[in-house]
Design a protein with these regions (language model features):
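Short helix-initiation/N-cap motifs at beta->coil->alpha
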Residues: 79, 135-143, 263-270
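Proline-aspartate-enriched helix->loop->beta-strand connector
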Residues: 150-155, 173, 279-282
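Bacterial Sec-exported substrate-binding components of ABC uptake systems
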Residues: 2-94, 200-226, 289-295, 318, ...
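Extracytoplasmic substrate-binding proteins
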Residues: 163-233, 329-345
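Extracytoplasmic ligand-binding site segments that recognize negatively charged/polar headgroups
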Residues: 117-122, 161-163, 178-190, 225-247, ...
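Structured C-terminal subdomain patch of bacterial secreted/periplasmic proteins
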Residues: 280-345
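A short, structured surface patch at a secondary-structure boundary
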Residues: 90, 96-145
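Basic- and aromatic-lined ligand-binding clefts that recognize polyanionic substrates
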Residues: 90-102, 201-255, 259
């Protein structure tokens, strides 16, 4: 059975994003920004990555034509083809998205590369993750540590580790998606194909999509606009459609402010323009140490304090590790739970 499946929503997003778009939202240093042609009225937009526009479409074409349980099997992926002689048992994951993916499929990885500055296993995965060893960070892999674990499969992305692929593939069969982020569903199916757990992945995605649709139904026809604000050490972002959280909100049918209805990762604003985050509900995340960001500066601005959502208690902090860093179906389901708690009365 072929695993070459993708969601209709992702197809539309990839087609609509005809220009070079932004990189994924899981880190602070993956993206550049283009300004609004010198206009003070138009926010900068996070951009980058030559394959961003087509990433979901391309990733959906990757995978295997092997039947369930069939090994050896050959996987096509972002870096070419990889043969797996037998079902993997010792898996190393190079980002949180792959971590979420394998754990949701019942696999306890032997190694994990966390985000910069945070070596901990994400709390929402800890119960089912086993005891994976640290193998560096997403941007600074420890190849010796990876080799020492004697993996039989390495899962990662071209965006994070293309320059390490040749070395990694000499350690173990290595399968790369193009990038993390709004392609999380396609990445999940690719990882599942390598693990011979495609049926499980499809079942998990179907359940997620039904859960998202039910949330939208239960909120009712008069849906509030949702603004997504994230504070990073060197920027403030309003996350848009081509992001992990953007796909979740779209799946639930939740509308966005006009400045976030773009086929990019995010708009970028200064603390002085924090009122551009205005919406019926504002959800804020922080990447890393809040003191290293301009969150306090932005939220002490009278423009922030005077927003209706802020005055009426509809501006809320959300966990960065699920809403922005999770990049997998387990995190996506937890985001839906959080949204339900706030939006369904």
């Amino acid at each position: 059975m072929s695993i070459r499946r993708r969601s209709t929503a992702a197809v539309g997003l990839a087609v609509a994003a005809a220009l070079s778009l932004s990189a994924c939202g899981s880190g602070a240093s993956d993206d550049s920004a283009k300004s609004g042609a010198g206009s003070d009225k138009k926010a900068a937009v996070a951009t980058g990555g030559k394959d961003f526009a087509d990433a979901a479409k391309k990733t959906a074409a990757y995978g295997t034509d092997a039947e369930a349980g069939q090994f050896p099997r050959t996987l096509t992926h972002a870096m070419g083809t990889t043969e797996l002689k037998s079902a993997p048992k010792r898996v190393v994951v190079l980002d949180v998205g792959e971590f979420d993916n394998v754990v949701s499929l019942g696999v306890k990885p032997v190694g994990y590369a966390p985000s910069e500055g945070d070596a901990a296993i994400p709390s929402y995965l800890k119960k089912d993750a086993g005891n994976p060893k640290n193998v560096g960070t997403i941007n600074n892999l420890n190849l010796e540590a990876i080799a020492g674990l004697k993996p039989d499969l390495i899962l990662g992305s071209q965006l994070r580790a293309a320059d390490k692929y040749d070395q990694l593939s000499k350690i173990a069969p290595t399968v790369f998606s193009i990038r993390p982020g709004f392609t999380w569903k396609e990445n999940y199916l690719l990882n599942a194909a390598a693990l011979d757990r495609t049926a499980k992945a499809k079942s998990e995605l179907d359940a997620y999509e039904k859960k998202a649709a039910k949330l939208g139904e239960d909120i009712g026809p008069d849906k509030p606009t949702i603004s997504m604000v994230r504070y990073l050490p060197d920027r403030i972002r309003l996350y848009a459609k081509a992001s992990f959280i953007g796909t979740i909100l779209e799946d639930a049918g939740l509308p966005r402010p006009k400045n976030q209805q773009i086929n990019d990762l995010a708009a970028e604003i200064s603390p002085e323009k924090i009122d551009e985050a205005d919406a019926d509900w504002i959800f804020t995340g922080v990447y890393g140490d809040p003191k290293a960001t301009k969150r306090d500066t932005a939220q002490s601005n009278p423009l922030w304090k005077n927003l209706k959502a802020v005055k009426e208690g509809r501006a809320k902090d959300v966990p960065d590790e699920t809403w922005y860093l999770g990049l997998g179906v387990t995190a996506a389901n937890l985001v839906l739970d959080d949204l339900r708690a706030d939006l369904v009365k």
